[in-house]
Every structure is written in C-alpha cells, then in structure tokens.
Regions:
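Active-site beta-strand termini and strand-to-loop segments that position acidic
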Residues: 215-223, 243-245
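C-terminal helix-rich "cap/oligomerization" subdomain common to oxidoreductases
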Residues: 1-4, 66-69, 221, 290-292, ...
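C-terminal glycine/acidic-rich active-site capping loop/insertion
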Residues: 122, 242-317, 321
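N-terminal Rossmann-like dinucleotide-binding module
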Residues: 2-48, 339
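Hydrophobic residues in well-ordered beta-strands that form the structural core
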Residues: 69, 92-93, 117-119, 148, ...
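Beta-loop-alpha module in the N-terminal Rossmann-like domain of NAD(P)-dependent dehydrogenases
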Residues: 49-109, 297
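Predominantly a Rossmann-like dinucleotide-binding segment in NAD(P)-dependent oxidoreductases
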Residues: 123-206
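Rossmann-fold dehydrogenase core element
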Residues: 105-122, 142-147
C-alpha cells in the first residue's frame, strides 16, 4: 500500500471460524481495516471493539468499501448480489452458489456494478500448488496427461445437527463442502473439462447429502483425464494430488490446515521427477522433494483481493469466471446423483 493511502474499509458478514480467519488474513496484508461485523451467534470475547450489525446494515453502510462473506452456503448468492448492488467489492467464501445458473445471475450483477468479486478457493494459493502451476506453465515437463485427486475426512454423529447436513442449506454434501477445492484445482491446473461421469452416493451416513463422490473428468481438446474421490468416510484424513505429464510427474501429499490432520509429519510434501528414458522401462532421476511447513494461502488470497481493488486489475485466481466454470462441472456431477 502507498504510504499515507487510506486502507480499504471492510465489513465481514459471518464471524465464526472462517470470518475470524479472514479478519486475521485481511489485517496481515496491511491493506485493509475491518470496521464492522455481522454475526447473530457471536461468542463472548470475540470481535470485541467492533460493531455487530445486521446483514442489511453492513451492506448499506456508506463507509464500508468491501464486504467479506463467510456465511452458511445458502446465503452466499443473495448476500453477494445485495453487496454488489450496494456498490461494494465482494469476497465470498466457497461455494460461490449452488448452481451454474446462480453464477450467471451473480455475474450479470457484477458486470453492472463494476466492482471486484472474488471467491475463496485458498488451495490455489498454497505455495506447493503455486509451484506445481509454475512447472506446468513452463512447459518443461510437457502437457498434463492425467490427474488424480483424493480428499477425505471423517465426521461424527454431531454432523447431523449441522447446517452442512441439510441439502437446502448446504447445496450438497462432501463434494460441495470439501471436494470442490480439489475440483477447482483440476480446473486451475488442467483447464476445462467437457465430459463428466460421476457416482454421487450416500454409502454410510444416510443423511440428506452425499458422503462420497467419485468423479471422472475429461478435457476433450487435450485428452487430459482427471479422477476425484471426495469422501467423508475417510477415517484417517487424506489429501493427495497426483499430476502426471509427458516428461515427468508431480505428487503432492498432505496439506497444511488449521487442524494439521491432513499434513505429512507436519508438512506438505511435493515430489517432482522428470523422466529420462523411453517407456515401457522408464526410469526417473532422483525425486526432488520439497516440504512446506507453513500455510500462507489465506494471506496471499486476501492480498490478491485487496490489491485488485487498489490497483484495478482483474482477479486471476478465484474470479467469477472461475466460479462459473466450476459450478457448471458441479452441476454435471449432481445431475448423476444416485440417491
């Protein structure tokens, strides 16, 4: 930020775990100042010194430049549209909406408003993922042939009591909640996907939303195929992303999160190797193994949002176009739901 320049004034709607995390990341950028929050179930001692207003009050305040939305999924679309119409820049947590049609409606309002709209897909901003993107973009390893992503967690019976277990409030289950991050990475690293085959099922928890999603995607132009397993019956938490290219591979095991339950011995481990002989007996140079111990994604993501507002450039990670492409793929998945 230019010295002496006024900070971007921010209101946060939804001040639970994610709202508080976004607050911390916003302040870490040095570009913004949170001046108000909206949280009907505010915990004692949280958000002290900040006015706790209604959603409408946050949206209508003239001294707020940008709104960060961290609410249950069913509120995301309506709050995004309301904030854009009120002339605010908007950062909204995933999922951006429930369907591709929802995103089309949001984009129409965004274009009328002329304001920045960005969505929270922080996995794109992990240092390990940015390294993968850099290598793919360099062309050194050739084109991406295939990708395989596995992302899973376990839940408890308490999950039945949460809004995430209700279709009308969450929009979907584990695929909408967690698998959407891996799907977003597929699009980020592999481009568009035209063909989608999915098995969306409820194998164990028997609730209103899916607990498992098995998805195969194909880019008809490049031939790249990606497979995804998103599950809430992964009793031992797992994050694994494999990318195999014409001349080598990259495998990312583990992800640094707040719980650290997805990490590999406290780190994200990225293995990189380049092939040096022809198939079928291909051998590889010694793998380069990079370990990442810190999650900087939240700060990077908020910095990108606030810099876009300040400098007037287009969002390049988590744009409304990214969200539209993603939700159209999600639509194709849920059209094949088997329960």
């Amino acid at each position: 930020m230019i010295e002496g320049k006024m900070k971007i004034r921010v209101g946060i709607i939804g001040y639970g775990k994610m709202g508080q995390l976004r607050h911390q990341a916003s302040e870490a950028t040095g570009l913004s100042e949170v001046i108000a929050i909206s949280e009907p179930n505010l915990v004692d001692g949280v958000g002290e010194g900040l006015p706790n207003l209604s959603h409408d009050e946050i949206v209508s305040r003239e001294d707020i430049d940008a709104i960060v939305i961290c609410t249950p999924n069913f509120l995301n679309k309506e709050l995004t549209i309301a904030a854009l119409r009120a002339g605010k820049h908007v950062f909204c947590e995933k999922p951006p909406a429930f369907t591709g049609k929802d995103m089309e409606e949001i984009i129409a309002v965004e274009q009328e408003s002329g304001k920045c709209l960005m969505y929270g897909f922080n996995h794109r901003h992990h240092d390990s993922v940015m390294k993968i993107k850099e290598i793919i973009a360099s062309g050194e390893y050739g084109s991406v042939l295939w990708m395989r992503g596995r992302y899973g967690k376990s839940v408890t019976d308490d999950y039945y009591k949460q809004w995430r277990s209700k279709k009308e409030l969450a929009g979907g289950g584990i695929l909408m909640d967690q698998g959407i991050h891996m799907m977003d990475l597929f699009l980020y690293l592999g481009g568009k996907f035209d063909t989608v085959k999915a098995e969306i099922s409820n194998l164990y928890w028997k609730m209103d939303v899916e607990d498992n999603a098995f998805v195969i995607l194909k880019n008809n132009d490049t031939g790249c195929v990606a497979s995804l397993h998103s599950t809430m019956t992964q009793w031992r938490h797992l994050f694994s992303l494999e990318i195999f290219l014409e001349k080598g591979y990259m495998v990312l095991n583990g992800l640094i999160t707040g719980s650290m339950s997805y990490s590999i011995e406290g780190a994200e481990q990225l293995s990189i190797a380049k092939s040096r002989s022809a198939a079928p007996a291909a051998t590889f140079e010694d793998e380069e193994r990079l370990r990442y111990h810190t999650d900087n994604s939240w700060n990077y993501e908020m910095e990108h949002f606030y810099e876009a507002i300040e400098q007037g450039f287009e969002i390049s990670k988590g744009s409304s176009k990214d969200a539209l492409d993603l939700m159209r793929v999600m639509d194709k998945c849920y059209e094949q739901k088997s329960f």
